[in-house]
Design a protein with these regions (language model features):
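A conserved acidic beta->alpha catalytic loop
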Residues: 35-43
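Hydrophobic helical membrane-anchoring modules
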Residues: 14, 93, 132, 163, ...
Length: 236
């Protein structure tokens, strides 16, 4: 099993300087950044430290992933936030758990033994609500269905149709935003009864940069997807 650590960035120079020295290159087979056209020196720092990177052309986290996907060498992808929210010491146990034959392993902020120091009342409630609804409506057993910090098979994206624009275009046009695919990945993986595990991992507060959440718009999209997915059977 080969693993690619995929790190999407947009003006995260402070987080990179603090977090990347904690990540040993030998933990994974590839470290790949995808940069959303940062203006704070992020790309220069990535170059100076000898990391692979892709410059994103279309806006939105989903397109960051899609544009990075052809450059991924691993058969397992571990998505990681460099803003301080993802604790680096969970990388090795997440990979070891994947080696047990799981399709996806989530580093959960809300599993027993973990906590989030980044949540406020609104985001904490939203994460709990959507995770609970995904479990109720789609047969999941998650404590954290929304988090970026997770490992999964690279080809899972194609199996679940997450690479296809048609599965996002209605809601993104309706609510004038672009979203990531983690919630939809959680829904479809649960509905397909894939092998899913969670390990606990704290979520520290963000380090520098600007929080990019669009709470109302993203929440509206996720609610739309949650209802729509109850009636979809073909992901191709």
């Amino acid at each position: 099993m080969k693993t690619t650590l995929l790190i999407p960035v947009l003006n995260e120079i402070d987080g990179l300087k603090a977090i990347m020295p904690q990540i040993k290159r030998e933990w994974v087979d590839q470290i790949l950044f995808v940069d959303g056209q940062s203006t704070d020196g992020t790309v220069d720092w990535i170059k100076q430290n000898g990391y692979e990177y892709v410059i994103q052309q279309k806006k939105g986290m989903r397109y960051a992933y899609l544009e990075a996907w052809p450059h991924i060498k691993g058969d397992v992808v571990l998505t990681f936030s460099p803003d301080g929210n993802s604790v680096s010491d969970r990388i090795p146990p997440c990979i070891e758990k994947m080696k047990e034959g799981y399709d996806m392993v989530i580093v959960s902020r809300y599993a027993p033994g973990a906590k989030s120091d980044d949540d406020d009342a609104i985001t904490g409630f939203g994460n709990w609500m959507f995770t609970s609804l995904i479990n109720l409506c789609h047969g999941g057993h998650y404590t954290d269905a929304m988090v970026i910090y997770r490992a999964y098979r690279k080809d899972l994206i194609y199996e679940l149709g997450l690479d296809l624009d048609k599965h996002y275009e209605v809601e993104e046009k309706l609510f004038h935003t672009r979203v990531s695919w983690e919630p939809l990945l959680s829904m479809r993986a649960a509905r397909k009864k894939l092998r899913i595990a969670e390990i606990p991992g704290d979520e520290p507060a963000r380090l520098g940069g600007v929080r990019k959440l669009q709470i109302i718009r993203w929440g509206s999209v996720f609610m739309y997807e949650l209802i729509r997915e109850m009636f979809i059977k073909n992901y191709k």
